[in-house]
UniProtKB/Swiss-Prot annotation:
Comment on protein domains: Has four distinct domains: an N-terminal nucleotidyltransferase (NT) domain responsible for UTase activity, a central HD domain that encodes UR activity, and two C-terminal ACT domains that seem to have a role in glutamine sensing.
The entry's keywords: Hydrolase, Magnesium, Multifunctional enzyme, Nitrogen fixation, Nucleotidyltransferase, Repeat, Transferase
UniProt xrefs under SUPFAM superfamilies: ACT-like, HD-domain/PDEase-like, Nucleotidyltransferase, Nucleotidyltransferase substrate binding subunit/domain
Record text on activity regulation: Uridylyltransferase (UTase) activity is inhibited by glutamine, while glutamine activates uridylyl-removing (UR) activity.
Role according to the record: Modifies, by uridylylation and deuridylylation, the PII regulatory proteins (GlnB and homologs), in response to the nitrogen status of the cell that GlnD senses through the glutamine level. Under low glutamine levels, catalyzes the conversion of the PII proteins and UTP to PII-UMP and PPi, while under higher glutamine levels, GlnD hydrolyzes PII-UMP to PII and UMP (deuridylylation). Thus, controls uridylylation state and activity of the PII proteins, and plays an important role in the regulation of nitrogen fixation and metabolism.
Catalytic reaction equation(s): [protein-PII]-L-tyrosine + UTP = [protein-PII]-uridylyl-L-tyrosine + diphosphate; [protein-PII]-uridylyl-L-tyrosine + H2O = [protein-PII]-L-tyrosine + UMP + H(+)
Family the entry assigns: Belongs to the GlnD family.
Domain ACT: 700-782, 806-875
Region entry Uridylyltransferase, spans: 1-343
Domain HD: 461-583
Domain of life: Bacteria
Source organism (scientific name): Mannheimia succiniciproducens (strain KCTC 0769BP / MBEL55E)
Uridylyl-removing: region residues: 344-699
Protein name as annotated: Bifunctional uridylyltransferase/uridylyl-removing enzyme
Length: 875
């Protein structure tokens, strides 16, 4: 099949791309037509085609086009000119949207008429629809500019003569081949610095969910780094030549070749579906590319399977690039001074600052010694791994007959790593990077490179898991106390940190299998813990942590934590203080490692409040619900202290007598004091104030007015029209019918509102509330969201309360969502008593406390009607 397909492509080349069938002059229209025919042929035969052939044919097309055009402009008659492919074009890597990089080389500066003709030649190439990277230089220019700029130097190193003066090209080759043009050490260090800067732009991880095929860590640029180092050192021009030079092992060559082919195929497919040059695999493109590559499955299965293979390729290339660069540095760059050698044990030595494996067969003959390697990394904080050690480790992992965890000695060493200071940073994270976790934990391979096709999880499952572990370890440092005071207080005193580390390792390990990943992961961690000799109580703790790792997050963010019944139910599941301490640390680390924008002081206070209430419930006992009266009085007293410190002398009791008990629970003492100052002697029926001082995780909007129909709808529409995100809504009605409502809002990027934006929003809300008409929402959809299919789901929580109904709404987040929801509530004469607004990537997961027109809980018929109307409106 492949041979037949390549024959088709070759036939097209003979007819079109050699330009033998084209009579007369080339025109931009003709070239564009032939480019389109080539693209169509590639699309029709892409699934079965060999990507190397596709790239070669593209390169050949460009070669013959430029050579013929060179003659058409009579530039072949000029003896002092050479047309040279450089950069990616020079190494024959042309994809459908690649830049066409070429150099027009001359020995001496051109006369004006020739310069004009060359300029017209370059413009013609642009007119044909190519993105052109053209330069016109003399030999002297190439020498001086190449020495000054590493990018120019690298391009020149990859030069390939297309047509023109061969002697001139040879002179260029001599210039760039001189040792003093870019000395090997200087060239290597410059390229490594480029790589470091590139990695920093991508958070030092291969696992960005909308990756750049070229520049992402592990992308094509990491392959190019290997090429460039080998090219500067030995003039090797391809992986095959690098293999022949002895720079890489046959096993390394096979792995690099396989992963290069995969990235080439993905990039070629991406270029076929785009109109403009780009190498980013954005979500919408991932779907199309996976289809073009033939990936199939229900829902997102096809795209997730492709992206898993993609991320595994990135990780393999990144690792190979690191190892080979380290190998080159150790052997060819570092000064040839005396090596400092220190014996660590029979198997390991320290050579300078690198851990060196003495016996090459050690890892194969005694696999448990692999764990010793990481123990030495902990003991010696400044040490790194020698390139030969890494290469032997990589080869040994491929020869294991079973999992390392099957070896008693390895299990003992693994558990010891978890108890060491910086054991996560210096052992577990490197073990993941170098493939040892995959060799240790049977289930780990299933999540390696596994992405979730959504906007919420910005890392793959394995990368997220390592970030959870890393975050947990930071709770041992006082430097983390400002952002995580509760966790820094609790984590050092946990009975056994190994339990939470292992629970973190397994909390998402069953993702991608179908079914409830928390339940399946609990089974996995139970088996692993039993294998490692933990007792029944410890095993049950780990199983519970994995099974319930989302429980605190859901309760804090999607339940009314000021409701004593909610606190009682949460405490009943947690059971005791030790579990609570474990759970809060795991939950916070999980949130922080999921998405860097999720954690803020508002959420910190939310989780701290739930922790505090649960503590109170444990201390009081589980026989009775919490009485919130004590907390209400404490908040009042603290608010009075704040007011007195500010010199506030007005009587607040008359104001507070109007407010229900919930008002003093749901607002902090600072907010209570702020409201008292705002409302002192207020005569207006409507007050809107916005401040950044009371919720560091967002901007607080406080609204005081006589309660009125559609109040919530008008407010959220006004906020939505200003392109803001709503994170929390607190609806409180005073005993005399006034709204004391608060909203937490941010800009779309999560930042606080600046002064001008706050004033504009105040006016917009006042105008909306004073208007007799409902505010029309103006806005544009987030185009990223259209690629996600989220069906609306309405859930009513099972409570025995007759005073209100609690409802959860799951739907696609979109512009004006809350306004649409509020409109449905309004149509059914429902009142919102409270709301929690949570956006999880592309999904809205909102919680509402509602009453009907009678001020009671919704009947079954009212629930059914509400559910149907919401689904009809939102889907």
């Amino acid at each position: 099949m492949i041979g037949h397909n390549n024959f088709i492509i070759q036939s097209v080349i003979l007819r079109f791309f050699m330009f033998q069938s084209v009579e007369g002059l080339l025109t931009p229209g003709l070239i564009k037509q032939q480019k389109e025919q080539l693209k169509q042929t590639e699309l029709e035969n892409f699934a079965q085609a060999d990507v190397n052939s596709l790239i070669s044919h593209r390169t050949l097309f460009c070669d013959n086009f430029l050579i013929r055009l060179w003659r058409q402009f009579s530039l072949h008659e000029v003896t002092d000119l050479a047309l040279i492919a450089v950069g990616g074009y020079g190494r024959r890597e042309i994809f459908p949207l690649s830049d066409l990089d070429f150099l027009i080389l001359t020995e001496q500066p051109m006369p004006a008429d020739l310069a004009k003709k060359v300029e017209e030649f370059i413009q013609f190439v642009w007119d044909c629809g190519f993105d052109v990277g053209a330069s016109v230089r003399t030999l002297e220019d190439c020498d001086s500019q190449g020495r000054a700029d590493i990018t120019i130097a690298t391009n020149l190193l990859e030069s390939r003569l297309l047509t023109g003066n061969e002697t001139l090209f040879d002179k260029l080759s001599s210039i760039v081949g001189r040792e003093d043009f870019w000395p090997r050490k200087t060239f290597f260090e410059a390229k490594i610095q480029e790589k470091k800067q590139r990695y920093q732009r991508y958070n030092n991880t291969s696992y960005n969910l909308e990756p750049d095929i070229k520049y992402n860590p592990g992308g094509l640029r990491d392959l190019h780094l290997i090429y460039w180092i080998a090219l500067r050192h030995s003039n090797a021009l391809s992986l095959e030549e690098i293999l022949q030079s002895g720079f890489i092992y046959p096993e390394e060559y096979a792995e690099l070749e396989r992963n290069q082919q995969f990235l080439f195929k993905v990039r070629f497919a991406l270029h076929l579906i785009l109109k403009r040059y780009d190498n980013r695999l954005l979500f919408d493109r991932q779907v199309k590319v996976s289809e073009l590559l033939g990936y199939q499955g229900e829902g997102n299965q096809g795209v997730e399977t492709m992206m898993k293979a993609f991320f595994q390729s990135l990780q393999a290339i990144s690792l190979a690039s690191d190892i080979l660069a380290k190998h080159y540095k150790e052997h060819f760059v570092d000064e040839n001074g005396e090596e400092e050698c220190q014996v660590l044990d029979d198997n390991f030595q320290m050579i300078n600052n690198a851990i060196f494996l003495v016996r090459e067969d050690c890892f194969v003959q005694q696999p448990d010694t692999i764990l010793d390697l990481f123990s030495y990394l902990i003991i010696r904080p400044q040490a790194e791994l020698h390139s030969s050690t890494l290469r032997l480790l990589h080869l040994a992992l491929g020869q294991l007959n079973g999992y390392l965890s099957e070896l008693p000695a390895a299990r003992e060493k693994f558990l010891r790593l978890l108890t060491q200071p910086r054991g996560i940073e210096r052992a577990l994270i490197p073990m993941h990077k170098y493939g040892v976790l995959t060799a240790y934990i049977p289930e780990w391979k299933g999540i390696e490179g596994l992405m979730q096709f959504d906007l919420f999880h910005i890392y793959t499952v394995d990368e997220h898991t390592m970030r959870v572990l890393a975050k947990l370890e930071t709770f041992l440092s006082e430097e983390t106390a400002e952002a995580h005071p509760l966790c820094v207080k609790l984590f050092p005193s946990l009975p056994d940190r190994a339990l939470i580390y292992i629970a973190a390792l397994f909390h998402d390990i069953a993702k991608g299998r179908g079914g409830n990943h928390a339940d399946l992961g609990a089974v996995d961690v139970g088996r692993f813990a039993a294998q490692h000799g933990f007792d029944c109580r410890e095993i049950e703790t780990m199983k519970w942590l994995v099974k319930q790792h989302l429980f605190m997050s859901v309760t804090a963010q999607r339940r009314d934590i000021h409701d004593p019944e909610v606190v009682m139910n949460f405490a009943a599941e947690v059971q005791n203080q030790v579990r609570l301490n474990y759970l809060v640390c795991l939950t916070v680390a999980d949130i922080c490692a999921t998405n860097t924008t999720l954690w803020n002081s508002w959420k910190r206070s939310l989780f701290a409040s739930l922790y505090q209430y649960t503590n109170q419930q444990f201390n009081q006992g589980m026989d009775n619900l919490l009485d919130n009266q004590e907390q209400e009085e404490q908040n009042k007293a603290l608010a009075l202290e704040i007011l007195q410190s500010q010199g506030f002398t007005e009587d607040v009791q008359s104001l507070w007598k109007r407010c229900p008990g919930d008002y003093f629970l749901r607002n902090t003492p600072k907010e209570l004091a702020w409201h008292a100052v705002l409302l002192a002697g207020v005569e207006t029926e409507l007050l809107v104030k916005i401040s950044n001082r009371f919720s560091a995780g967002g901007t607080e909007v406080f609204i005081y007015c006589k309660d009125r129909p559609n109040l919530f709808l008008k407010v959220v529409a006004a906020i939505g029209n200003k392109k803001l995100s709503i994170h929390d809504a607190q609806i409180i009605t005073s005993l005399d019918g006034y709204a004391f409502d608060s909203f937490i809002v941010t800009e779309l990027d999560g930042s606080l509102l600046k002064f001008d934006r706050r004033r504009v929003l105040e006016k917009a809300i006042i105008n909306s509330l004073n208007s007799n008409e409902l505010t029309k929402l103006q806005g544009s959809e987030n185009h990223k969201l259209q690629h996600f299919n989220v069906k609306t789901e309405v859930r009513f929580l099972n409570t025995e309360k007759t005073t209100h109904t609690e409802m959860e709404l799951f739907t696609l987040d979109k512009a004006g969502l809350l306004a649409d929801v509020s409109l449905v509530f309004s149509e059914l004469n429902l009142s919102i008593q409270n709301a929690k607004i949570t956006t999880i990537g592309e999904k809205a997961q909102d919680f509402f406390i509602l009453t009907n027109a009678k001020g009671e809980a919704l009947s079954e018929r009212e629930r059914q009607s509400l559910s149907e109307k919401l689904q009809a409106r939102l889907d």
